[in-house]
């Protein structure tokens, strides 16, 4: 499992189950902002993008296989410079291809602009979302990659009802093989309690909805998991992770279902936050040696990205 520090462009690879450090890798390319975010990782390829301030601009994107020491910078998106976008990275199982989806996030009214990059064509093209026009995409995942589950990328979005000026939460899916959008309902019960933050993740290959709630006395994460994909009735509350008065940020899940969190620890002198791996079955915590706020993705070695234009070996 690789993670990237926000202070130094270094990728650290750790064991998935224990988070014990294996080795560090210097990232062989630069970003204008000096900070990188892991957009996703599949079949040995990491997709990284630049971060400007607190938003992902997605104007500089790289595909990188550290195992074979090759990378390529993606061509400029056809939509050009955008203030804020959300990015998804996926493996195209039908054509053995890789896809990057770039969606503009508008702070006013939708619709959003959408474009798709494929590695085989090495080009971007615009696509239309044939759903309701008044859907507004959110970028609530922050450290978490946009989850790829059952061949689809998943975003939190809002359906703006014009007459009532009310925004209803929903999940929007992009199916990579057919390039079609559809929407999923939120799990029953997940919206009954007001939440400070809602994000999506892949938990052991299943779609998970994570709600973060804070009150005067405690902070907690509640994780809902869809046991049968596309069947809302199969969603169930898997567990609740209470953190007392400790502020915690969900960084990501490991392949075996452990949760990596970043929590404020005022007792530490040299760092404001500490990173903890939580066993979601026993709720036991294990400290990690991650020192700074990071983006995390799962990783498995491969020989992908051997061919193609604008490939750089180092």
Task: Describe each model-derived feature in a short phrase.
Residues 1-314:
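N-terminal entry/capping and adjacent linker segments that precede and initiate structured domains
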């Amino acid at each position: 499992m690789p993670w990237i520090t926000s202070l130094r462009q270094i990728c650290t690879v750790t064991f998935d189950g224990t988070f014990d450090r294996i080795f560090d890798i210097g990232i062989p390319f630069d970003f204008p902002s000096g900070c990188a975010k892991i957009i996703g990782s599949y079949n040995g390829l990491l997709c990284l993008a630049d971060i400007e301030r607190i938003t992902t601009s997605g104007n500089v994107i790289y595909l990188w296989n550290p195992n074979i020491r090759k990378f390529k910078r993606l061509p400029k998106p056809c939509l050009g410079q955008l203030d804020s976008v959300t990015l998804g990275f996926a493996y195209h199982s039908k054509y053995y291809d890789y896809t990057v989806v770039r969606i503009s996030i508008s702070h006013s009214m939708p619709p959003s602009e959408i474009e798709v990059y494929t590695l085989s064509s090495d080009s971007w093209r615009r696509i239309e979302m044939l759903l309701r026009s008044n859907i507004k995409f959110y970028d609530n995942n922050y450290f978490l990659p946009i989850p790829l589950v059952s061949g689809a990328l998943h975003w939190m979005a809002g359906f703006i009802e014009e007459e009532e000026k009310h925004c209803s939460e929903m999940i929007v899916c992009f199916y990579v093989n057919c390039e079609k959008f559809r929407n999923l309902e939120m799990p029953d019960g997940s919206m009954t309690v007001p939440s400070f933050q809602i994000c999506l993740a892949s938990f052991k290959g299943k779609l998970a909805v994570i709600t973060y709630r804070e009150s005067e006395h405690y902070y907690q994460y509640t994780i809902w998991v869809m046991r049968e994909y596309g069947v809302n009735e199969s969603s169930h509350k898997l567990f609740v992770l209470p953190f007392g008065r400790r502020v915690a940020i969900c960084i990501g899940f490991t392949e075996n279902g452990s949760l990596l969190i970043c929590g404020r620890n005022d007792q530490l002198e040299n760092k404001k936050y500490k990173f903890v791996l939580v066993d979601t079955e026993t709720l036991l915590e294990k400290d990690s040696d991650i020192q700074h706020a990071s983006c995390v993705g799962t990783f498995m070695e491969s020989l992908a990205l051997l061919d193609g234009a604008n490939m750089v070996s180092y």
